[in-house]
């Protein structure tokens, strides 16, 4: 399942497409078009949050849940942002962190109903990526004045700095749950 995005122009998109292993199919669209969003969960139970609503740095706090058929707006993030990272395996429990405008360190926990501010990242940054669950996660990369290789792990209560990436990058993709996972791509 993929959703949102940005096309030259610039314009943000609300399209959602699902993949069945062979082909992509257009399904019900997001309620609000955005890019720079974060999301987690399988095809049947996903959540996404934040984003940029106009491709010009207009941070959003909106969240939407996917039930396998359609999106529904749900409780907003406490802090509007885009280019944020996160972790989670379904729409009932997730974690989001970092983001822009001006790099943010905020971390918020999703309990299936609302977002709660919890312990901040040690280093605030945008274009951060992560993987894991809401109680055991990894946050990495990001771009301050230059791409960063910072890595922090979350134990359900606080963040701890750990070994950096070999090469600092931003806008990475990621997958996995701790103790193993991977990050890839990025300029």
What are these regions (language model features)?
Residues 1-187:
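Polar, enzyme-active/binding microenvironments
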């Amino acid at each position: 399942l993929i959703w949102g995005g940005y096309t030259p122009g610039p314009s943000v998109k609300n399209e959602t497409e699902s993949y069945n292993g062979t082909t992509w199919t257009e399904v019900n669209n997001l309620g609000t078009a955005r890019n720079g969003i974060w999301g987690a969960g399988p095809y049947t139970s996903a959540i996404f949050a934040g984003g940029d609503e106009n491709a010009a740095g207009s941070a959003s706090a909106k969240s939407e849940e996917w039930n396998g058929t359609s999106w529904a707006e749900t409780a907003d993030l406490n802090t509007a942002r885009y280019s944020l990272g996160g972790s989670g395996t379904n729409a009932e429990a997730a974690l989001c962190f970092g983001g822009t405008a001006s790099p943010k360190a905020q971390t918020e926990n999703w309990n299936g109903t609302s977002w709660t501010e919890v312990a901040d990242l040690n280093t605030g940054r945008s274009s951060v990526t992560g993987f894991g669950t809401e109680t055991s996660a990894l946050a990495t990369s990001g771009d301050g004045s230059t791409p960063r290789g910072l890595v922090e792990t979350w134990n359900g209560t606080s963040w701890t700095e750990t070994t950096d990436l070999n090469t600092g990058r931003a806008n990475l993709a990621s997958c996995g749950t701790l103790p193993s996972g991977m990050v890839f791509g990025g300029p």
